[in-house]
Amino acid sequence: MQITTNCLNQYIKSFIQKQKLLNINEAACKFFTKYLFSTKGSMALNYLRDRGLSIDTIKEFKLGLSPSKSDGLINSLKSEGYNEQDIENAGLAYKPENKPLVDRFKNRVMFPISNLDNRVVAFGGRSLNTSYGAKYINSAETKVFKKGSLLFNLKRAQKSSKNDPLVIVEGYMDVISLANNSINNAVAPLGTSLTKEQLQLIWRVCEEPILPVSYTHLRA
């Protein structure tokens, strides 16, 4: 009985921790979206509009913008009652040695990444300034986010796959640009190659996906 009780307690503890991570990511998503549509987000919004995206599409995918300051998101989440450890555990910030906690994403167009329950679990960020490192980065991996086990837009594409096969494309903007033109059955990996876990997800949803030649090399 003691073992059963311990297992139950561990399950409850893990469930509560994961729910907190999901809630933090949802709060971050709202913050990024609000910031994109503020006066400070005009350059990023123009970038997305110049890429041909409609305002409706931008809102549908909950695209956002991270501030250029190093603690914009941190301060917002703290004001909602989350502490620094919570924010770091959610993969949204990191702490350099002997320095304060800093936002992981700075001055980036933000792409929310959702699980099959349609909950935001992480973000991809596209840099608007080359001085902020790599062109694209993702949230750090967490208890609710493993980069090689998810696909961008899978939940939405799953609905369309009843009539059309899944189409695997390269990245976030490819998926969103297709959706902007009423093609809703596209998904994208969260890195440069498809993993076996991602392929299993694809085949679970669609028996005959359209797989580009560039993705026929799989990561072991």
Regions found by a protein language model. Give the residues of each.
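Short, well-structured beta-strand/strand-turn elements
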Residues: 51-64, 182-192
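Conserved short loop/turn motifs at secondary-structure junctions
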Residues: 13, 33-37, 61-66, 215
